[in-house]
Amino acid sequence: MTEVISNKITAKDGATSLKDIDDKRWVWISDPETAFTKAWIKEDLPDKKYVVRYNNSRDEKIVGEDEIDPVNPAKFDRVNDMAELTYLNEPAVTYNLEQRYLSDQIYTYSGLFLVAVNPYCGLPIYTKDIIQLYKDKTQERKLPHVFAIADLAYNNLLENKENQSILVTGESGAGKTENTKRIIQYLAAIASSTTVGSSQVEEQIIKTNPVLESFGNARTVRNNNSSRFGKFIKVEFSLSGEISNAAIEWYLLEKSRVVHQNEFERNYHVFYQLLSGADTALKNKLLLTDNCNDYRYLKDSVHIIDGVDDKEEFKTLLAAFKTLGFDDKENFDLFNILSIILHMGNIDVGADRSGIARLLNPDEIDKLCHLLGVSPELFSQNLVRPRIKAGHEWVISARSQTQVISSIEALAKAIYERNFGWLVKRLNTSLNHSNAQSYFIGILDIAGFEIFEKNSFEQLCINYTNEKLQQFFNHHMFVLEQEEYMKEEIVWDFIDFGHDLQPTIDLIEKANPIGILSCLDEECVMPKATDATFTSKLDALWRNKSLKYKPFKFADQGFILTHYAADVPYSTEGWLEKNTDPLNENVAKLLAQSTNKHVATLFSDYQETETKTVRGRTKKGLFRTVAQRHKEQLNQLMNQFNSTQPHFIRCIVPNEEKKMHTFNRPLVLGQLRCNGVLEGIRITRAGFPNRLPFNDFRVRYEIMAHLPTGTYVESRRASVMILEELKIDEASYRIGVSKIFFKAGVLAELEERRVATLQRLMTMLQTRIRGFLQRKIFQKRLKDIQAIKLLQANLQVYNEFRTFPWAKLFFNLRPLLSSTQNDKQLKKRDAEIIELKYELKKQQNSKSEVERDLVETNNSLTAVENLLTTERAIALDKEEILRRTQERLANIEDSFSETKQQNENLQRESASLKQINNELESELLEKTSKVETLLSEQNELKEKLSLEEKDLLDTKGELESLRENNATVLSEKAEFNEQCKSLQETIVTKDAELDKLTKYISDYKTEIQEMRLTNQKMNEKSIQQEGSLSESLKRVKKLERENSTLISDVSILKQQKEELSVLKGVQELTINNLEEKVNYLEADVKQLPKLKKELESLNDKDQLYQLQATKNKELEAKVKECLNNIKSLTKELENKEEKCQNLSDASLKYIELQEIHENLLLKVSDLENYKKKYEGLQLDLEGLKDVDTNFQELSKKHRDLTFNHESLLRQSASYKEKLSLASSENKDLSNKVSSLTKQVNELSPKASKVPELERKITNLMHEYSQLGKTFEDEKRKALIASRDNEELRSLKSELESKRKLEVEYQKVLEEVKTTRSLRSEVTLLRNKVADHESIRSKLSEVEMKLVDTRKELNSALDSCKKREAEIHRLKEHRPSGKENNIPAVKTTEPVLKNIPQRKTIFDLQQRNANQALYENLKRDYDRLNLEKHNLEKQVNELKGAEVSPQPTGQSLQHVNLAHAIELKALKDQINSEKAKMFSVQVQYEKREQELQKRIASLEKVNKDSLIDVRALRDRIASLEDELRAA
């Protein structure tokens, strides 16, 4: 390491070594406080380690080779370009910037871009002398300065005829705005012209800075003059290099600052400048005071900034307004808006006891409305109790206190933002002076990267913009540069600097997968969406899927995003409101009608939406969120940058305390790392930043070489010959395919040599020209001498000739001859001059017109291009949404087909399992018969066993001992309960269940044979019978416990199924919401083919109705069979109880207990089967009623089949969801089969006896029946859900039809208005032709006809009222009385037929009455459905009250009696409820048919009314013709 450092220090590029000055070897080492510090190597250690001593200290430290960096020689201190440093490392770059900063040299070159450090003080480096200095110097001799970058951009624009851009970037408080001002100052100075108009443009461009700073800048924690908006200033230049125009584009105004400011910050400067600098007259006119504490939006902020006089700044603002051409009215309008905002913040809002808001200070409202130019009453009403549209009606909504306060704040922010936009537009109007073709230099000044204690939506947009700008810088500096090296095929190794910011940008803006802004836009249009739902949705999308995204500790409060500068925590509170930018439309419309023209102009878009209506509807534009608008503006800005040659200025914050001559090394080093400064220096030193095409290089520098003149030399070869002749080092340039690439500084050296060559050549040229001119002067003098001599000779001859008489005559006549010819020539020339002037003027006018047309076409073209880009962006968004929905639809259809196939397989399996179940039931019946034969045999043994009564007492003692052993059995029960809980997690599949049942049947047969053998042995061995009795009692108790546990397990499974059904409903809702979007997009395309499918679905539903009817009858028969079985079971239980009382023998008691146990099991299983069948019967009845109602509604709404297709799609989706759930249940069943078989194998040694096997068989059969029934129930629920969705779609279609009828009704009303206007014309005609009696008679006849039609209409209305009364009577009476009222309803139908066919305009009232009657009938229909639902609910409650008793094992006789009593009561209740249900169903069907007939008749009446309207139009037209004829 010693040799390496010494070599680096002594031999690098021939640099002067530190040893020439100092014998110490100086290095940089890291320091926790100052980032790095100087030290010198005291001793070399083995393993490449060193002992170093700190500078100005005796502290020593052992460091490794990787922990030190060499220090540059002293001659490189405060170097102008950091690319010239010998050792390029982070401490060296930071130290160079620090040394220059402390010596007030705030600008430093960093390769191809400029680094500017904020001095936090004024420096005399922007004067006119400095501007002239940089204007006169060549590029190589220019010291680092912002003027140098501006001059480079200007020269490139003139030489290359290419648009330029200067990106001033950096963190907040780094001095971006100040550097932007200096760039504009320099461009205005060097591009100035002698003409008055051009100088005025330059002055106006400079004066825009104080205006924009006053209205758009504010004090923040890090900057006293922070730009709270982004601006892109385009300075346009003519072809001659003079400033012709300027334009300003603005982005992301922080309008929330108007109403809220953080601690130690303040509002926009203009508020404080107005209160401090305005005179008394203006304040009185604006109703303002001098104190900032009088206004709520200012009193909590910092009022004064050190070193800034708001009063003087206000004078500067007024002077800028005057220079920019603002008149007094425009100035007053701007200040009036500021006063409006201040008064708006002083409105006090309270609430009454009911929570409704009320305004507490009417005086402040009067002031505000006076400034706004609106009525105080209307303003207060629209603010506190606005009118909102609920459906098709306008209602008054009472607002709460918080709603009114937020509405006021939103209005204040909107007014300030709109006023700022108007101000920028007005500035652009003042700066637009020429329409000629030009190039521009764009200067970007936008808010820097921001990290506050609480970062919201505004900070995300600002940081997203800076992320894009930083990516553009990295792409231009590192990627494009090296890509061009590769494209030109020069020798270069690609360097990856690791600055790929695309993952963070994709996380913010990408549409698929959905990013932050797209997710926010989706949540803004979702109903009942909140900030918490947005955050949770975003967390579900990106958690653990992107390294750039991290959740908050509390996930619903925000998230953390990794930017290029740092990790930023964002709080999502209020993001939905900020993105939608809500505004009280009632107040906005009121302001659009304001008497204050400026206020009305700001809200002119609400005035346009009020006037542009079509058929009574407001025509609104496409809704765009704040995120969408910002993303579009940012994309347009980046497109402009990509079409220009960029120049970069990286601004650096030296300290966070805003102190001069204070340099925080860790802070600056972090910014250098983030901004890519070090990488830019490295690529500048290693690469070839300057390049020229071969032809340009030859044209520019061939003057310095001697190329062959006789033959043609190709440009590439000529360029190489020039470089060889100029003796340029080959390592300093590379020859590409079409260009020559140079190291930094080489092209500047060539330029200097070219200038020297030109100077030498120009000197030679000057000498030759001067010699030529002197020779010309000498020759002229010789000619003058010869002319003088000739004149002298001629004068002598003239003197002699003058005395000759004829000569006098000749001299007198000669002028007279030539004057006449001269006059003619002069007149001819004057005429030609006049004609030429006329033609010139004509051509100038035509030229101006062409230029004007060209400007208009260019403006229209730019407008069309902007519109096209926005439309393309919208189309891309819609295409992306459509593509996602199509992909989801395709996936849904695929899964639907799979689940459909699985459902068919399940149905086949369920059929086979049902058959197996029937076989098992038959075998069980055979078993019961065999048991009865055994009982008969055991009755014969009663006499033989009478002698063993004494032994019974001993067995009772054994029973008591068995009770003591019950504790041990309970432990076994706990183990069995745990096993049952494990069985609850999975459900038995149908295929595995078949194998298991067959296995149990075979085991059961063997056990029956063993039971027979044990019964035979029972007579021989009484001692063994006593032991078996004790064992049987244990088993009975154990089985009873197992029965109770299994019943509890069944209840738990039911609860789990209910929870699954709830989850299914939630999933169905989400799927329905997604499918609605797909259906709305495809509804217009698939209308015609859907009609056929809908008709087929109607036929299928009719068939389904018939199948349900037959199934209903079958279920009723099964119910009867179950009741008969219950009766037989109760009789058998009574018989067994008598036998149990007569038993005095242990063996007989064992047999009776076994029989009772079997009967109890059968009874429980029968009860469960009966309940399931009864529930299935109820579901079938409900399904039949739903099918009937749906069938009738669909037949009635046959004209709206297109809307029903969407319900069918939802039905298929829900059915698919059910099938997928069934498939998941199928998988769970298969898992349970495996677990059950495993458990059975484990329990087989314990359950080797007959009772245990019987109990398990019955339990398994019971579970099988439950599973089959649950599967059927799920299918029925799926059908019911599909029908409910279908009903929902039908109701939506009815709503659409009602809306269409309302539209037609509005049309008819318009026609009525036209007829009324015709009547007025008729009255005028009567006055004019009053003498004609025939017209009067005709009019009287028409009036008589109108009276007749009114009478007819009244009679029709009376009939409608009678119908309504009958309908109310139907609702009030019970079902028995409803049948008697049916004929009365039918008798009213001929009344409609008896109405005369002659119709008038008043038939419209009849049509409205019919419509009302139709709605009343619909309400009655819904009420009947509610009654039906209540009856069904009562039946379900009765059913739920039936709780089957559980045997305890202590008193079997009481349990059997209780079961018999409950079964009997249950039987009576079921019969009564069944009778009620059948009667209600019959009455419901009759009543439903009557209502449908009435609805059909009303529809006919509506059709007739439409026909009558058309006839009425024809009659009106005929009357008009008659009147015209008269």
Swiss-Prot record:
Please provide, alphabetically and separated by semicolons, the GO molecular function terms listed in this UniProt record: actin filament binding; ATP binding; ATP hydrolysis activity; calcium-dependent ATPase activity; calmodulin binding; microfilament motor activity
GO CC, sorted alphabetically, is: cell division site; cortical cytoskeleton; cytoplasm; cytosol; medial cortex; medial cortex septin ring; medial cortical node; mitotic actomyosin contractile ring
Enumerate the spans annotated as IQ domain: 758-787
User: Which terms under GO biological process does the entry name?
Assistant: mitotic actomyosin contractile ring assembly; mitotic actomyosin contractile ring contraction; mitotic cytokinesis
Which InterPro entries does the record cross-reference, listed alphabetically? Kinesin_motor_dom_sf, Myosin_head_motor_dom-like, Myosin_N, Myosin_S1_N, P-loop_NTPase
Every Myosin N-terminal SH3-like domain range = 22-73
Q: Which SUPFAM superfamilies match?
A: P-loop containing nucleoside triphosphate hydrolases (SSF52540)
Entry keyword annotation includes Coiled coil? yes
| PROSITE patterns per UniProt | IQ, MYOSIN_MOTOR, SH3_LIKE
UniProt KW keywords: Actin-binding, ATP-binding, Calmodulin-binding, Coiled coil, Motor protein, Myosin, Nucleotide-binding, Phosphoprotein
Read off the Pfam families from this record: Myosin_head, Myosin_N
Quaternary structure and partners: Binds to cdc4 and rlc1.
Q: Which family, according to the similarity comment?
A: Belongs to the TRAFAC class myosin-kinesin ATPase superfamily. Myosin family.
Q: What is this protein called?
A: Myosin type-2 heavy chain 1
Name its species.
Schizosaccharomyces pombe (strain 972 / ATCC 24843) (Fission yeast)
**Gene expressing this chain:** myo2
